[in-house]
C-alpha cells in the first residue's frame, strides 16, 4: 500500500511527533505496547501506511527519531508511547546543536546524517510502494532546522520522485524562544523552497491563540499545541488510511495546491474546535464545519488569510456526510467570497471525503490552503533577519562553523524573492498579465 515514512528532528519535531503517534495509534486501535485492541476491521485494513507489522502481530511505527542531544528522546522513550518505537530508529548525538543552524547543517549534523540515512533506507526498503516522507521539525532551533533541511536534501537526492512533506514550526511574531531564530529560519526556508514538495506552516503563537480563544484553555501546554497539530496531520493522511468516497493523497494534494513550484507553503486548519463547555450548544453540520474551517482564527499560523487571496485550497472532510453537500458548501464559499480567491484559477478548491471520523467526533475537516497572505510570515522573519544581519550580529557563531556570509545573503534574497512572487500573484488579474488592479477593501465572510 501507499506507505509514508515519518521523520522527526530536534526537540520540537520529536514532541510533535510523539503526540502525532498517540493520535494515530488511537485511531488505528493500537495500544502503547503495539498490540491491536480496536473494534473495527477498517482500522487494520490500511494500517501499513504508518506501521510495520512485526512478529507476534505487533505494530511498529515507521518512524525515525533524530536529535543531536539525547534529552528529548529519553523523554519520548519514557512517555506513554515510548515502547512503541523500534529502538534502532532512535538516532542521536551527544553534543547538541545549540540553536545554531550551521552546527546542525554542516558540522555536528553532518557527522550524524549517515546513521540517519541508513535507518531511512531500511524503512524505505520495507515499503511496497513508498508514497513519500513527512518530517516534523521547527525552523527556529539548530537541529530541526539545520539537520532537518540537510536530511531533506539528502533524501531528495536519493528519492527524487517521492513526495517530501514537512510540518515546519516557524518563529512566532511576538513570542521568541531564541535570539537567532530569524537566521535559522531564513537559512531553512532557503532549503525548503528548493527541496520540499509541500510545507505546512505552523507557529506557536497562532496555536496559543486557538487554545485561548476557541478552546478556552487558561494555561495551554506544549502538549495541547501539539495535539492541535497532530489532529491536522492525521487529517492530511486520513484518505490513505481509511476508505472514503473521494480520496486524496500527498501527491494529489500537491498537484491540486501548487500552481507554481516555489509557492508550496500552506496554511493548515482543523475544525471543529470548541471549548469543553460550549459543545452541546452547537450542531456539527457541513456548513458549520466549512464556516469554521475558513475562519481566520482557525489557521495554525499567524498570517491572516483576509490580507491575501487563496491561490488554491483543499478541504478533507471526515465522517458520514453527503458529498453533494460538501461540494455545494465549497462552491458557496467561493461564490460568496470571490474576492478572496484568485479569479485566474477557476474552481480552485479541492475536497475529499473520508468515511471514518477522528476519535470522539462525528465529523471533522482538515483544511490546507495556499494563500498569498503567508508572505506576511516570511516578511516578518526577513525584516528581523535584515536588522541583525546588517550589523553582522551573532554571525561569528555561524562563520566559526565554516559558513560563508554569501550564504546568508543568498538565503535573504531567496526569501525576499518568495515574498515578491506571492505579491505578484496576489495582484495578478485574469484579463491581462502585467496589468495590476487596485485591491478591494476587506469584506467579512
Curated annotation (Swiss-Prot):
Q: Where is the composition biased (Acidic residues)?
A: 429-445
Enumerate the residues binding Mg(2+).
Answer: 69
Q: Where in the cell is it found?
A: Cytoplasm, Cytoskeleton
Q: Which cofactor does it need?
A: Mg(2+)
InterPro entries noted in UniProt = Beta-tubulin_BS, Beta_tubulin, Tub_FtsZ_C, Tubulin, Tubulin/FtsZ-like_C, Tubulin/FtsZ_2-layer-sand-dom, Tubulin/FtsZ_GTPase_sf, Tubulin_C
Q: Which residues bind GTP?
A: 11, 69, 138, 142-144, 204, 226
Gene3D superfamilies from the xrefs? Answer: Helix hairpin bin (1.10.287.600), Tubulin/FtsZ, C-terminal domain (3.30.1330.20), Tubulin/FtsZ, GTPase domain (3.40.50.1440)
Q: Where is this region: Disordered?
A: 426-445
One GO MF annotation is:
GTP binding
Entry keywords, A to Z: Cytoplasm, Cytoskeleton, GTP-binding, Magnesium, Metal-binding, Microtubule, Nucleotide-binding
Q: Name one Pfam family in it.
A: Tubulin_C
Additional comment: Tamoxifen used to treat breast cancer blocks the interaction between apicortin and, alpha-tubulin 1 and beta-tubulin resulting in microtubule destabilization.
Subunit structure comment from the entry: Dimer of alpha and beta chains. A typical microtubule is a hollow water-filled tube with an outer diameter of 25 nm and an inner diameter of 15 nM. Alpha-beta heterodimers associate head-to-tail to form protofilaments running lengthwise along the microtubule wall with the beta-tubulin subunit facing the microtubule plus end conferring a structural polarity. Microtubules usually have 13 protofilaments but different protofilament numbers can be found in some organisms and specialized cells. Interacts with DCX/apicortin; the interaction stabilizes microtubule assembly.
Q: What does this protein do?
A: Tubulin is the major constituent of microtubules, a cylinder consisting of laterally associated linear protofilaments composed of alpha- and beta-tubulin heterodimers. Microtubules grow by the addition of GTP-tubulin dimers to the microtubule end, where a stabilizing cap forms. Below the cap, tubulin dimers are in GDP-bound state, owing to GTPase activity of alpha-tubulin.
Q: What family name appears in the similarity comment?
A: Belongs to the tubulin family.
The protein's name: Tubulin beta chain
Instruction: Say which species the protein is native to.
Output: Plasmodium falciparum (isolate 3D7)
